[in-house]
Design a protein with these regions (language model features):
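Conserved Rossmann-fold NAD(P)-dependent oxidoreductase catalytic core, especially the SDR/UDP-sugar
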Residues: 2-51, 56
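Strand-loop microenvironment adjacent to phosphate/nucleotide-handling motifs in alpha/beta enzyme folds
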Residues: 22, 52, 56-73, 78-253
């Protein structure tokens, strides 16, 4: 649901940030995502908007130090493909992959936690830190390796008597074949070679606050077209690849 995504990712971040300021929290770290870079769907656009909120608040005089850490998928975390593939293999398949060419960044939970904590200590205010995720992994290869590591054979045209079939379901609306971690190329090194500081464009609080006010009104009016328009206004690199996908929007239509 688009409105709940906006409420959670944008206004949820804003509420937490304002609470941190009012209670004197010293450091606030936002966990962002590679989907915030040149977003093609509402989720990615709202995550980039959340980054803009913290960048704008950092430009105001307050005692809370805001930092943003942007990275990709975390192996074994909730919603990760690993637990899904394990479950599908255990149930006899098929293992579902959206596209044979789709690739994604991955890191372990331990790596992610350590780098996020270190990034928080490096922040100077409004920083966007990008973690070195290594090479992107082909999801199709990951699925095949997991089937083989389970002691099973892939069922396909070359091996029709195999155990587990891989089913290609097609990219979902707004889904990319690959993700990026940087909007621009303006980065600088930090004390940790696996953490880069990215210089990203920001928006002044006065302008952003006006868009936030308009978002609230559009949510109350269930104006989904206006919501998309405002997201594009705040995040110019948001390039929706499809019509608005939302059950409530379709019902209102």
């Amino acid at each position: 649901n688009n409105t709940e995504g906006i409420n959670n990712n944008i206004f949820g971040t804003l509420n937490c940030a304002q609470a941190a300021i009012s209670t004197g929290v010293e450091t606030f770290v936002l966990i962002s995502t590679d989907k915030a870079v040149r977003p093609t769907n509402t989720m990615g656009a709202t995550k980039r908007f959340a980054e803009l909120v913290l960048q704008a608040l950092s430009s105001k005089n307050n005692n809370t130090l805001f930092s943003i850490v942007r990275f990709g998928n975390v192996l074994g975390s909730s919603g990760s493909v690993i637990p899904l593939f394990k479950k599908q293999i255990k149930n006899g398949g098929p293992v579902t992959v959206t596209d044979p060419n789709i690739i994604r960044y991955f890191m372990t939970i331990t790596e992610a936690v350590e780098l996020v904590i270190q990034s928080g200590s490096m922040g100077e205010g409004g920083d966007v830190f990008v973690l070195d995720m290594g090479e992107q992994v082909k999801i199709d290869d990951l699925a095949k390796k997991m089937i083989k590591l389970s002691g099973l054979q892939i069922k396909d045209d070359l091996n029709p008597d195999g155990d587990i079939e891989i089913k290609y379901t097609g990219l979902r609306p707004g889904e990319k074949l690959f993700e990026e971690l940087l909007i621009g190329k303006n980065t600088s090194e930090t004390d940790n070679p696996r953490i880069m500081r990215a210089k990203e464009e920001m928006m002044e609080w006065t302008k952003l606050e006006g868009i936030l006010d308009e978002l609230r009104i559009a949510i109350n009016e269930n104006n989904y077209l206006k919501l998309r328009e405002l997201l594009i206004q705040a995040v110019p690199l948001f390039k929706p690849q499809c019509d608005i996908i939302d059950i409530l929007y379709k019902k209102i239509e």
